[in-house]
C-alpha cells in the first residue's frame, strides 16, 4: 500500500521515521536504525524511481509528543497533547541522538532515497531544543540562543559529513512557533543562516506547534496565510526555501514562487485529495484537480487518533490497492443519494 501510494504521487517526502526507538510517534512506530531494515525502503524507492519520481526520507524524533512511556525531551515538562510526561535527555544521550540522525541518513542513501528531511518544526524534539519554552537545560545544549540551536546544527553537520555530496540534506525549520516562549522572527532568520552554513541544501518551512491554540491548516485559515513567516526565512539564506501550509491550488503556489517568497512549494493534504495534482497542473488542467477542502476529518483527525489516514474527497487515498484504476467488464448503474463531499467524490470515482 505504501509503495503504491508513493508511486502515484512521485516527488514526495516519506515522513516520520525516527532515528532511535524512543523517538517514535507511538508504540510500534517507525524506526530506521539497521541495514537489515532496508528491504521495504528499497521496494518503495524503486517503485517511485521507476515511475520517474524522486523520494526523500523524513527523519523525525517526536520528543515530548511521542505517545510512549519512554518519551524524552530537552527538559522535563509534559505537552498538552500527550498523557506521557517526558524524561530530560542527558548530555550523552543528546550526542547519541545526533549520531542517530547521521546513521539513519546514511541508511536512507543506501536505500535509494535522494535525500533526507530533518524534521525541526511542529514542536517535535529538535524544535523543543530551539525554544526557551521547552529547553531549560544548563549544559552546552541549553540556555542562551546559541546553545539552544546547537543540537539541530550538530545534526545537520553530522548528516552532511555522513552522506555523499549529491545526497540532499533538507532542514524543516519552524518559521513561526505560535507559542509563548518560542523563537522570534529575528531568531528564526539567524537560525536559518546557520543551518545553511552547517551544510543544508534546502530549507522547508513548518508553521506552528501541534499544541498551539492558533489554527494553521483548517478551512477558515486563508490560503498561504503564513507566507510572511516563510519570506522571512527566504530573505535570510541563499539556498532554496520551500513553502508549506494551506497551499492547495496551483495559482496560489505559482504566485508564491513568482513573488520570491519561496523557491518551491510542498503539499501534503492536496496530494491525498488528488495524486494527479502536479500532472494536471503541468498539463494546464487545473480545473480538473480534486481540491483539498482542508476539513482535516479523514487525515489529521484520524492520524491523531491512531487510525490510518484517508481523504474525505478521495476515497482511494490509503486504499490504492483495494481501489485501483482497472475498469470492470460488467459496468453497472448506481444512484448516489447525498450531494455532500463524500457523495460527490463517490459519484466521480
PLM features: what roles do these ranges have?
Residues 173-175, 207, 245-246, 266-269, ...:
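Active-site proximal loops enriched in glycine and acidic residues that flank catalytic Cys/His/Asp
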Residues 281-331:
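Cysteine-cluster motifs in flexible loop/terminal segments that predominantly coordinate metals
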Residues 216-222, 324-326, 331-334:
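Short, contiguous acidic/charged loop-to-helix segments that flank catalytic cores in large enzymes
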Residues 261-280:
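Glycine-rich phosphate-binding active-site loops on the catalytic face of alpha/beta enzymes
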Residues 10, 18-42, 46-242, 251-255, ...:
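Alpha/beta enzyme core
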Residues 3-5, 235, 326-330:
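Short, flexible hinge/linker loops that cap or flank conserved catalytic cores
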Residues 334-349:
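N-terminal Rossmann-like FAD-binding beta1-loop-alpha1 element of flavoenzymes
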Residues 1-13:
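Single conserved hydrophobic/aromatic residue that forms the stacking wall/gate
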